[in-house]
């Protein structure tokens, strides 16, 4: 079984290292205020869209927006030089 959370985080970390010019992820990871603010704003925006999809009972959109929330949250973790393992350990502690 694959581990999509770790795999996605690995891609984000790769973009952080290589900073490809036309990468959306790299633009969010830019070492400037614009990049940091953009990633934080996207977490809020996508969380709002997730909540609205839940309110509307739209399960397809809920899955889509949930994935967007998780992706942007992982970008913020990478910005903060955290590893996805810290998040997974916290989740594991809550079981």
UniProtKB/Swiss-Prot annotation:
**Gene Ontology molecular function, alphabetical:** ATP binding; phosphoribosyl-ATP diphosphatase activity
Q: Name one GO cellular component term.
A: cytoplasm
Please indicate if the UniProt record lists Hydrolase as a keyword: yes
Keywords for this protein: Amino-acid biosynthesis, ATP-binding, Cytoplasm, Histidine biosynthesis, Hydrolase, Nucleotide-binding
Q: Which residue windows are coiled coil?
A: none
Q: Which enzyme class, named as a word? A: hydrolase
Instruction: Give the catalysed reaction(s), semicolon-separated.
Output: 1-(5-phospho-beta-D-ribosyl)-ATP + H2O = 1-(5-phospho-beta-D-ribosyl)-5'-AMP + diphosphate + H(+)
Q: Major location, coarse class?
A: cytoplasm
The family database entries (InterPro entries) matched by this protein are listed as: HisE (IPR008179), PRib-ATP_PPHydrolase-like (IPR021130)
> Part of which pathway?
Amino-acid biosynthesis; L-histidine biosynthesis; L-histidine from 5-phospho-alpha-D-ribose 1-diphosphate: step 2/9
Subcellular location, record wording = Cytoplasm
In the record, the note on similarity to other proteins reads:
Belongs to the PRA-PH family.
This protein is called Phosphoribosyl-ATP pyrophosphatase
